[in-house]
């Protein structure tokens, strides 16, 4: 397999074939909380992708010099440093979105996807493949966030990225926003529906009956 094909596989596989949320069931809490708007879902996707990619790269660079007994602490320190950078950048340039994301930016530190890729992949792989793996898993996480955020904002408020898409009754249109879509349970059901769709498309992901 060529280098280009390997890169494509590393980036695309976590989207449908091995999605961190849909198949591995990781990072679900933040997916429920930050998807009321497409804007916050998109920014969270960028933040997690940035942290996962650079933490993978950094851990891989020094993996042969990390004592096994403190490897988790070292990984956490690297991830926490990157999250602090992301948090400060958001507060400086996207303050309103930073307020909407609230504590969930800081909680990237404990996101199982970020920690999982650092431990399972970066500790055993070269820096560049680790970087690509981080990007792929960040995009896989973002695929679910953006899909859920799209439907929640569209049907919950009739808007996308804050701009009116469906003519609202309050403005003389025909669409009455469904407030239920803006509540956390709706995200839970949408994620479940998305998992169902993915497993129809990818039947090999269905667990075997015991």
UniProtKB/Swiss-Prot annotation:
> Subcellular location, in the record's words?
Cell inner membrane
GO-annotated cellular components: plasma membrane
What does the record note on quaternary structure?
Composed of six subunits; NqrA, NqrB, NqrC, NqrD, NqrE and NqrF.
- What InterPro entries does the record tag this protein with? NqrD, NqrDE/RnfAE
For this protein's source organism, the top of the classification is: Bacteria, Pseudomonadati, Pseudomonadota, Gammaproteobacteria, Vibrionales
What UniProt keywords are attached to this protein's entry?
Cell inner membrane, Cell membrane, Ion transport, Membrane, NAD, Sodium, Sodium transport, Translocase, Transmembrane, Transmembrane helix, Transport, Ubiquinone
EC number, UniProt record:
7.2.1.1
Q: What Pfam families does the database record attribute to this sequence? A: Rnf-Nqr
The UniProt function text for this chain reads: NQR complex catalyzes the reduction of ubiquinone-1 to ubiquinol by two successive reactions, coupled with the transport of Na(+) ions from the cytoplasm to the periplasm. NqrA to NqrE are probably involved in the second step, the conversion of ubisemiquinone to ubiquinol.
The similarity annotation says: Belongs to the NqrDE/RnfAE family.
Q: Could you give a GO molecular-function term held by this entry?
A: oxidoreductase activity, acting on NAD(P)H, quinone or similar compound as acceptor
Q: What class of enzyme is it?
A: translocase
Protein name (record): Na(+)-translocating NADH-quinone reductase subunit D
Q: Which reaction does this enzyme catalyse, per its entry?
A: a ubiquinone + n Na(+)(in) + NADH + H(+) = a ubiquinol + n Na(+)(out) + NAD(+)
Question: Which positions, given as ranges, span the membrane?
Answer: 42-62, 72-92, 103-123, 131-151, 178-198
| Single biological process term from Gene Ontology | sodium ion transport
